[in-house]
């Protein structure tokens, strides 16, 4: 299991190794210095979309931020028992996720199993460059994309522009599990 409390420290180490200031990271990522400082000093995992943006700005893979060693293979098999839980029992952002391709080096896409809890603490909108796919494996959720709202059930699939504010909220008494794939351009 990946320790959430280590992610911020690892990001800070990579930033300092590259001799980048928070101001320079702000310019590279579009995230404010204040937010970046919180990410580096928090004990909770930031949203996966933020981790991807930070990895690209640092010139590393998300796997490296997660502390995993990815192989330079043309194929990667991650067995169910090998999945890495990145944020357990939900985060301050209201969800948890498991990596599905952490063994593949320099991915163009980041696949996860996303779990939305029944009663999240808070659910902010997310917004980042790129595109996402959400395929609902279990449960029902209400999904917001800009000013649009969708009810998405087991077997339904969303493909959307991630630069538009978006988020999902569990509906009903059962958590929602989704296959989530994020593509963020270089």
Question: What name fits each language-model region?
Answer:
Residues 93-96, 153-154, 162-186:
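Ligand-binding loop in jelly-roll beta-barrel domains
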Residues 9-26:
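Short basic helix-loop element that most often maps to the first helix and adjoining turn
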Residues 30-44:
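Recognition helix of helix-turn-helix/homeodomain-like DNA-binding domains
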Residues 11, 22, 33-35, 48-51:
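Helix-turn-helix DNA-binding elements, focusing on the entry/boundary residues of the two helices
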Residues 80-87, 93-103, 110-128, 162-165:
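Conserved short histidine dyad/triad with adjacent acidic residue
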Residues 15, 25, 47-58, 62-66:
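Hydrophobic micro-packing sites on short alpha-helices
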Residues 100, 146-161:
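Short acidic-glycine-tyrosine-enriched beta hairpin
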Residues 115-116, 128-143:
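Short, conserved beta-strand element in jelly-roll/cupin
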């Amino acid at each position: 299991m990946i320790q959430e409390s280590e992610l911020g420290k690892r990001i800070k180490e990579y930033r300092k190794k590259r001799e980048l200031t928070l101001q320079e990271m702000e310019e590279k990522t579009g995230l404010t210095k204040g937010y970046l400082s919180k990410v580096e000093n928090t004990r909770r995992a930031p949203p996966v979309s933020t981790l991807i943006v930070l990895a690209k700005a640092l010139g590393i893979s998300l796997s490296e931020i997660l502390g995993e060693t990815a192989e330079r293979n043309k194929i990667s098999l991650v067995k169910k028992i090998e999945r890495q839980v990145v944020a357990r029992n939900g985060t301050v952002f209201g969800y948890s996720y498991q990596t599905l391709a952490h063994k593949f080096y320099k991915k163009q896409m980041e696949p996860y199993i996303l779990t939305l809890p029944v009663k999240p603490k808070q659910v902010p909108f997310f917004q980042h460059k790129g595109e996402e796919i959400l395929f609902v494996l279990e449960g029902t959720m209400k999904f917001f994309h800009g000013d649009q709202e969708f009810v998405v059930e087991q077997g339904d699939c969303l493909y959307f522009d991630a630069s538009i504010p978006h988020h999902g909220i569990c509906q009903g008494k059962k958590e929602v599990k989704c296959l989530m794939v994020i593509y963020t351009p270089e």
